[in-house]
Structure formats: C-alpha cells, structure tokens
C-alpha cells in the first residue's frame, strides 16, 4: 500500500516528536512492504510567524489531498497576546472544521510497565484501565449560536448556546458503537439528561442507534457521576461517548489518571476524508529543542493512523509491541523516568522503537 501523509509539525516540541513518528512509520513500511510519501505544512504559531495566519489555505489544501494527517502540537506563550481569532489554537479548530472531523477518539490505557506512575490507589490500578473516550467535536456549546458578551439592564452578561441536532448525535453514536464492537462491546453514553434538554435528545438518539447494535451493551451515566466513577473504578468502562463539552473534560481526566500523559495518542475522524492523528499533550515550549520530549504518544498516534486510517491492524500491532518492548527493557524519557531505569532522549527513544519494529 502507498500512504500519502501530510505532516503538521506545529510548535514547541512538535517538529521533534513528528520526526520520530515518521521514523517509526518508515520502519513499519519497510517491514511490511508499504511505501510512504510525506509533505509538511504550517499550522499554529509557526504558520502565524510565516504567513500571519494560524491556518494558511495551502495547509488546508495539503491536508485535503493527503490520505491522513499527523500533527505535532500547537501553541505557546509567544502568541498568548494575540486576538483570540489569530491564536495558534484556531489553526487546530480550523483544520478540524475544514476536514469535517466530528469524532475525537482518545484511548486511555495504563501501561503495565508504568503502573507505578498511575495516580490511582494500587488496588484500583491493579483492576486495569483501558478505555476510549469518543467525543463529538463540532457541535455543543463550543459552536452553538448565539454566543457572546453584551450589556443587559446595565450588567455585562455572557451567554452561549448548547445545541445538538439528531443527525450530529446519531453519527457520533455510530462511531462509538463501531469502536466498541472491535473492543469489549460496551458503550457508556454520558450526558446530563436530568437537567438539559440537549442531553435528553442525546439519550433518545443514542438509544435509537443502539437498536442497530444488539451485540453491544449500552448504559447511560450522568456526567458528574462519570467524573467520579473514572477515578473510583475505571475498569468498568470500555467506550465512553459524549458531547463536546463533557468529552473535553472527561478525556483529560481519563488521560491524567494514567500518570503518563506523554504516552497517549488520539484520532479525529470524519466521514470519508483524511483523518487527523496527534498526541494529546501540548507543545511544551520549555523543553523544545532540548531532546527531552517523549515521542511515544506521537508514535502511538502513527499506530492509530495505520489501524483506523488504513485498516492495517498488524502494522499497528507491531508499533504497540515495539513500544512495550522498549519500556520493558527499561528505557525512559524524563517525564516517565523511574529509579533503576535508563534515561534516553527524544531521538534515542525513536531509534529504539524503530529498531524493534
């Protein structure tokens, strides 16, 4: 198979970690007889510095004509004083919209080799943590209109609109059920249906979709309880599906309790065009250019790209196995370093994983 990948290195540590991701991708291609072509485009702060825009038209076109997109990270304090519409993060929101990416899949798994880093009580961690948060990306209170700040009766008043239509709910629910079907066949839909009309529609539509998946178990949970249950007993979850706002919060919570946020990948997918794959961590400008960044989340994002973007499960499994082997051999970047382990830098970690493909 030939794969045409658009690289968006972005800001901070982005270029360093994307370089390691492509190194591992090349190793996979050699082993399995594939070919890869890559092109790089600007996004975020790097794009602002070069063009004045966080998402140049040329970047959108490069992404649209690719088979998949691999992103590093965007943002940094250098651009914090810009107007909100000109900041680096607008580039990420913009490319998601331009590519029609409505579903964000964020796995949160506890690596046995890093069990000591888990923030949960030992008995809870021992029960395991292996779940996926499927978050709707393009609707909800983040994009609903009207929204703004205005003066009412002499008082400044802020307002947003939480809104979903049934088609938006239906398509994200199908992604969740399809994801669960390839895992442990359990979906937990998270909402606030006891208070919000939006959530009542959400629950109704998810139940309608569930009828097409009789082999998948569906449960419902209010978001406040879900936040508690993620800490209390995360082993109960397989796939969590929820809206944009709740998903933003819960996916970060699920990630951080693993204790190794530098290890976790993500995918943003649409309905037919190229998908976008990226690590969940930020641009870490404080360590940029110092060979300190952990590239494993980006490398695992390449694995997600192979699995979800190209249907290459064996190739994705090879990446997962190589990462586990390197960790089992005791190699660590600074963010996951433990006593008695071997400290390595960004490039060395990429080399070690690529050599074990």
Curated annotation (Swiss-Prot):
First-listed, main subcellular location of the protein, grouped into a coarse class: cytoplasm
Any one GO MF annotation of this record: NAD binding
Pfam families referenced in this protein's UniProt entry, alphabetically: Iso_dh
Pathway given in the UniProt record: Amino-acid biosynthesis; L-leucine biosynthesis; L-leucine from 3-methyl-2-oxobutanoate: step 3/4
Superkingdom to which the source organism belongs: Bacteria
Cofactor (UniProt): Mg(2+); Mn(2+)
Catalysis performed (reactions): (2R,3S)-3-isopropylmalate + NAD(+) = 4-methyl-2-oxopentanoate + CO2 + NADH
Cellular localization per UniProt: Cytoplasm
UniProt: substrate binding residues: 96, 106, 135, 224
Enzyme class: oxidoreductase
Residues bound to NAD(+): 76-89, 282-294
Residues that coordinate or bind Mg(2+): 224, 248, 252
Cofactor note: Binds 1 Mg(2+) or Mn(2+) ion per subunit.
Keyword Cytoplasm: yes
Keyword Nucleotide-binding listed: no
Gene Ontology BP terms: L-leucine biosynthetic process
Keywords annotated in UniProt: Amino-acid biosynthesis, Branched-chain amino acid biosynthesis, Cytoplasm, Leucine biosynthesis, Magnesium, Manganese, Metal-binding, NAD, Oxidoreductase
GO cellular component, one term: cytosol
Family matches, as InterPro entries: IsoCit/isopropylmalate_DH_CS, IsoPropMal-DH-like_dom, Isopropylmalate_DH
Subunit structure: Homodimer.
Function: Catalyzes the oxidation of 3-carboxy-2-hydroxy-4-methylpentanoate (3-isopropylmalate) to 3-carboxy-4-methyl-2-oxopentanoate. The product decarboxylates to 4-methyl-2 oxopentanoate.
Family membership noted in the UniProt record: Belongs to the isocitrate and isopropylmalate dehydrogenases family. LeuB type 1 subfamily.
Name recorded for this polypeptide: 3-isopropylmalate dehydrogenase
Source organism (scientific name): Nitratidesulfovibrio vulgaris (strain ATCC 29579 / DSM 644 / CCUG 34227 / NCIMB 8303 / VKM B-1760 / Hildenborough)
Source species taxonomy: Bacteria, Pseudomonadati, Thermodesulfobacteriota, Desulfovibrionia, Desulfovibrionales
